[in-house]
Amino acid sequence: MNSKIFAVLLLLGLLSCVLSDQYCPKSSITACKKMNTRNDCCKDDDCTGGSWCCATPCGNFCKYPTDRPGGKRAAGGKSCKTGYVYY
């Protein structure tokens, strides 16, 4: 009896971990003119209020995580600069 309860609780715990995954929201923009590219952030630490630094075709922006996959977190790195990006 106790092993069945333990198995059910373990299954519920694993299920809640899987369901609680968070992602950057999918961008509705598929392309952007280079002159409109801007980075508001390069890493999550640049964002406030629990938002993440997410990559879009028009640059990196702070977005609140969602439970739907499809978006992409900004890679950051030394070459990332905030502000308008000029090529």
UniProtKB/Swiss-Prot annotation:
Matching SUPFAM superfamilies: Elafin-like
InterPro entries recorded: Elafin-like_sf
Single GO MF descriptor: toxin activity
Disulphide connectivity of cysteines: 24-54, 32-58, 41-53, 42-80, 47-62
Keywords: Antibiotic, Antimicrobial, Disulfide bond, Secreted, Signal, Toxin
Keyword Heme: no
Location (main, coarse): secreted
Single Gene Ontology BP annotation: defense response to bacterium
Entry comment describing in which tissues the protein is expressed: Expressed by the venom gland.
Subcellular localization, as worded in the UniProt entry: Secreted
An example Gene Ontology CC term for this record: extracellular region
Domain WAP: 21-66
Residues of the signal peptide: 1-20
Free-text description of this protein's post-translational modifications in UniProt: Contains 5 disulfide bonds.
Function: Has antibacterial activity.
Family note: Belongs to the venom protein 11 family. 01 (wap-1) subfamily.
Entry protein name: U15-lycotoxin-Ls1h
Protein species of origin: Lycosa singoriensis
